[in-house]
Amino acid sequence: MTQTIFVLNGPNLNMLGKREPGIYGGKTLKDIEADCKVAGRELGFDIDFRQSNHEGTLVDWFHEADEKAVGVAFNAGAYTHTSVALHDAIRAISIPVVELHISNVHAREEFRHKSMIAPACKGVICGFGPHSYILALHALKNITA
């Protein structure tokens, strides 16, 4: 039976390809989903790829992932810097979570330098463009093997 990885995406990531391509590149979230599914197959994972602009939905998906998946790759978007609820949802589950970002958040505005969720995650990957997602999948393969 193939193991499942949830790839969860937070607010405004549905706008990739349109929103600030100089920062986030030209790939859409659908493009990234397709890349993740290919990489997932190569790594032996089924990829459950989701996006929501709503914090509570993301919390619910973490609870669901704990029952159905072996790990989560998570791009929280702006919730990275504000959400105690997502921090607590990650702490509440038993599977590893890798925080990821397309841009290097540490090379951007000061308010983006602090992650509320990083202390609850197994690790953080940022700054490698859409390839950050693939790196997160490789990290999860390594820590769930």
From Swiss-Prot:
Disulfide bonds: none annotated. Substrate binds at N75, H81, D88, I102, S103, R112. Pathway: Metabolic intermediate biosynthesis; chorismate biosynthesis; chorismate from D-erythrose 4-phosphate and phosphoenolpyruvate: step 3/7. GO terms for biological process: amino acid biosynthetic process; aromatic amino acid family biosynthetic process; chorismate biosynthetic process; quinate catabolic process. CDD domains: DHQase_II (cd00466). Its EC number is 4.2.1.10. The record marks R19 as: Transition state stabilizer. Keywords: Amino-acid biosynthesis, Aromatic amino acid biosynthesis, Lyase. It catalyses: 3-dehydroquinate = 3-dehydroshikimate + H2O. GO terms for molecular function: 3-dehydroquinate dehydratase activity. It comes from the Bacteria. The active site is at Y24, H101. Belongs to the type-II 3-dehydroquinase family. This is 3-dehydroquinate dehydratase. It comes from Rhizobium etli (strain CIAT 652).
